Structures are given as structure tokens and as C-alpha cells.
Amino acid sequence: MTKHYLNSKYQSEQRSSAMKKITMGTASIILGSLVYIGADSQQVNAATEATNATNNQSTQVSQATSQPINFQVQKDGSSEKSHMDDYMQHPGKVIKQNNKYYFQTVLNNASFWKEYKFYNANNQELATTVVNDNKKADTRTINVAVEPGYKSLTTKVHIVVPQINYNHRYTTHLEFEKAIPTLADAAKPNNVKPVQPKPAQPKTPTEQTKPVQPKVEKVKPTVTTTSKVEDNHSTKVVSTDTTKDQTKTQTAHTVKTAQTAQEQNKVQTPVKDVATAKSESNNQAVSDNKSQQTNKVTKHNETPKQASKAKELPKTGLTSVDNFISTVAFATLALLGSLSLLLFKRKESK
């Protein structure tokens, strides 16, 4: 009898099971990659929406100016504090938007406020708009149209509290701590394109600085001449003494001349050293000025490069697109390979 692993039927079953495993693995890889790509795209969309919301909010805030203002709700016809004051958050805000003024306040237990109306000193009803209605916190932010100079508002409200069967309408007056002030216009966002700084052109030196040549004064040696000996005696002894005196004076004259020559050389030598030192220092100063000018030119040339780099926008989204394309391509190739193997094995089994 032939062994089971040599049986052709057994081999075909093993092949079909292997193909099923490969197909299931490929399908799971494709599904996993699609789920990952979908989650990544959702995160990108959420981040984009959050950024847009932040930008819109910052734009709205920049278009309006506000200032806090304190107030108190008092009973009608008296200066006694009303219970309505406890259901409003303090302080309020004075807002100027689109050249219009609003008094903004937040109502606590907003579900109790069935009706609220505000009137000015001339008993004219003021427009009221809801800015934010938070059902979870049970608060409501409202804007009441006002004008600069208003000191108080008359309020007519309808409050219903089902838990205690409270259902009443009453009139109160809202007193501001100070009159509604006049606010400055909001600073509009600057849409002016930034001016690119132009590199300053270095000034070309027109005249080259020449080293100053120090003036050297020639020192004239002072030679002292000895007086002539006029003793001319007739005796021989005296003439001998005079000749000796003349030789001594000549020797002294030559010695003094040599000393004065040496002193002149000594004077000329330090003067020359001072002149050379000054010329070297002047040349070094000129070279330092040139190096500073070249450094300034290089710095000014680098500034437009940095500005151009700042202009470049960050390349966002390219990495995620590349990952998406590579993943889809890999999954497609794997699926095609598994299908081709499956078709090939079916042909062999037939």
C-alpha cells in the first residue's frame, strides 16, 4: 500500500488547504492595511478641522474688542438686591463688534428662564441674541444691544422652576457699576505682505589710506673747538710744551667728533623704529576695516536667503500620501499573486 503522503488526493487536499491559508492571510493583510489607512485619514481630517476652527475663532476674536463690567440686579422700585442676580454670572462684558455695542452676560439654570426682555431708559426694547446655549452645563450666553452711556437696563423675565412649582413674571432693573464706555476699534489682521530687507551695498573706498610718514629731524652734532694756543715763546722748552698741548687738543677733538657721530646714529635708529611701527599699525587698521566690510557684505547676503527660507511653506501630507500609495500597491500585488496561484493550482487539479 502506498503511504498517505504519496497519495495524489492527499497532496491535492494539502495544496488546497495551503492556498486557502495564503488567501486568508492576504485578505487579512489587505483589510488591516485599509483599516489603518482609514484611521490615519480620519486623524488627518480631525486635525485639519481643529486647525480651521482655531483659525476661525482667532479671527472672530480679533474682529471684536471687549471690556469687563460689573453690575447688580435690583428689585423694581428699590435698591435691594434681587434673586435674579444670583442666576447671572459676574462680571459681564461690553463688546464692540462691527461698530455696534453689546452687553454680554451668562445665565445660570438657563432652563428656568422661559422669557427675558431688556429695555433702555426710554422703555424701548433692546435686541437680544443667543451666543451660546450649553445644554449640558445648563447655561446660556446672550448679547443685549446697548449704546455707550447706558447706566441701567430694565428687565422683564418669566421664571419657571418645576421642582418647587415656581412660575412667576416680574420686573427688575440691572444697574451697571459705571456707564457703558466707548471702546476703541478692534485691530484688523494685517494682510500686508512683509517687506523683504534689501542687502545694503558696501561703500567702495574712494581713497586708500596711506600710512603717515613721520618726520625725522636731523640732529646736528655740536662740535666744540678748542682755543688756539698763542703762546709763542722763544725758548725751546716752551715750544716743546705748546706742541704737546696741540696734540692733546687734536686728540680730544677727534674723540668728541666720534662720540657725536655715535649719538646721531642712536637718535636716527629709534626714530626709524617708531616710523616703521606706525606704518605697520596703519596697514593693519586698513586690513581690519576691509575684513569688517567683507563680513558685513556676507551677512547682508545671507539675510535674503534666510527670508526666502522663511517664506517656504512646510510640505504637509506628502508622507501620508506616499505611505498610502505604497500600501495599496503592496496589497494589490499580494492579491494578484494569490489569485494567480489559486487559478494555477485549480488547473493542475483538473
UniProtKB/Swiss-Prot annotation:
It comes from the Bacteria. A motif (LPXTG sorting signal) lies at residues 313-317. The keyword Heme applies. GO terms for cellular component: extracellular region. Residues 1-46 form the signal peptide. The modification Pentaglycyl murein peptidoglycan amidated threonine is found at residue 316. The keyword Nucleotidyltransferase does not apply. Residues 62-184 form the NEAT domain. Residues 299-314 have a biased composition (Basic and acidic residues). Residues 203-214 have a biased composition (Low complexity). InterPro entries: IsdA, LPXTG_anchor, NEAT_dom, NEAT_dom_sf. Induction: Repressed by fur in the presence of iron. Changing residue 83 to A: Does not affect heme-binding. Changing residue 102 to A: Does not affect heme-binding. Residues 317-350 form a propeptide. It is found in: Secreted, Cell wall. Heme binds at residues 75, 82, 166. Cell wall-anchored surface receptor that participates in the extraction of heme from oxidized methemoglobin/metHb to enable growth on hemoglobin as a sole iron source. Receives heme from IsdB and transfers it to IsdC. Also plays a role in the inhibition of host immune response. Protects S.aureus against the bactericidal protease activity of apolactoferrin. Decreases bacterial cellular hydrophobicity, which renders S.aureus resistant to bactericidal human skin fatty acids as well as to beta-defensins and cathelicidin. NCBIfam families: LPXTG_anchor (TIGR01167). This is Iron-regulated surface determinant protein A.
